[in-house]
Amino acid sequence: MKITRLHTYRVAPRWMFLKIETDEGISGWGEPVIEGRARTVEAAVHEFGETLIGKDPARINDLWQTMYRSNFYRGGAILMSAIAGIDQALWDIKGKALGVPVYELLGGRVRDRMKVYSWVGGDRPADIVQDMQRLLEGGIDTFKLNGCEEMALLDSPRAVDAAVAKVAAVRDALDMRVDFGLDFHGRVAAPMAKPLLRALEPLRPLFVEEPVLAEQAEHYPRLAASTSIPLAAGERMYSRFEFKRVLEEGGLAILQPDLSHAGGITECHKIAAMAEAYDVAFAPHCPLGPVALAACLQVDFVAHNAVLQEQSMGIHYNRGAELLDYVINKDDFRIDAGFIRALPKPGLGVEVDEERIVHASRNPPDWRNPVWRHADGSVAEW
């Protein structure tokens, strides 16, 4: 079998699908994208594609290493996201060719179902309780919401109190019927992270995500020592080499690599195994589309330390399309009592509606994240 062609499709809301075709008529799908930089990743995918044409798609490890190591400059969000989507599509091809789900190729399932959670509240959390109550009625009892809005390097105690008040309102309304993680989203700098974490402790969040930016990872051990809340990070780390450093230094209880940003299934399967050796949980980041989610689930079902899976149904970014709008086998993605079962179809387990994808790609979105500013006019972390 040989790779013959790569197609990319940018579609609403902010996703990009990749189709890799072969000379035997088997095609694989991936989801390589950086939210807000889709066109840049698209260029990288096609640049890698020039070296993939004519190659055997079954040699996934060799193709991965070739894409990663054959260029002097490597890594980073753009290149690793391009590799990630290609890698997903290659695993999809191999599973389809052999007639088995990818998790069978990775050694088989260690669990029967996977716990999932939903995003609520938007960039500036609002209507949180109503959103949670609606989803709770549908069987989802675990959530994530942004833990704060802009926060200056040194901010007023009032900013801490305002953030805590929003979270307290959720706990007061729903008590312990729900679990929720809080995403600081890199908005909080080290001087403010410690008092904010301390103030949130009585509300018993499941975890705090990106308590500080990944480039400030040296603060993770210090922050972990100051709080009982499990700390999580990883969506802005792109290879096992970056995760190696945070595992060695400690501080994180949960790793959250994104399988569309951190090298795909091949790389994130290794990251999960590394985390297990340090008694650290694995909870892939995935506010993206159905192919990305399907790729995450393949690793979730073989990684013993996988604890939670993010999924984007109803997320505030989904304007123009919902998670399953481009999926034919929607029933396979059904969530029951907060869990999803292993996808049974060969490959990644997602049957995409190619006709709808092609049609949607004729009017591609150009999504950009907003630029926020502090009260003094300086740029704030979004």
Curated annotation (Swiss-Prot):
The keyword Heme does not apply. Pathway: Carbohydrate acid metabolism; D-galactonate degradation; D-glyceraldehyde 3-phosphate and pyruvate from D-galactonate: step 1/3. The record marks 310 as: Transition state stabilizer. The active site is at 185 (proton donor), 285 (proton acceptor). One of its GO terms (molecular function) is magnesium ion binding. Its EC number is 4.2.1.6. Pfam families: MR_MLE_C, MR_MLE_N. The record marks 258 as: Increases basicity of active site His. Catalyzes the dehydration of D-galactonate to 2-keto-3-deoxy-D-galactonate. This is D-galactonate dehydratase. Belongs to the mandelate racemase/muconate lactonizing enzyme family. GalD subfamily. Reaction proceeds via an anti dehydration. It comes from the Bacteria. The keyword Lyase applies. Its cofactor is Mg(2+). GO terms for biological process: amino acid catabolic process; D-galactonate catabolic process. The gene is dgoD. It catalyses: D-galactonate = 2-dehydro-3-deoxy-D-galactonate + H2O. Binds 1 Mg(2+) ion per subunit. Mg(2+) binds at residues 183, 209, 235. Keywords: Lyase, Magnesium, Metal-binding.
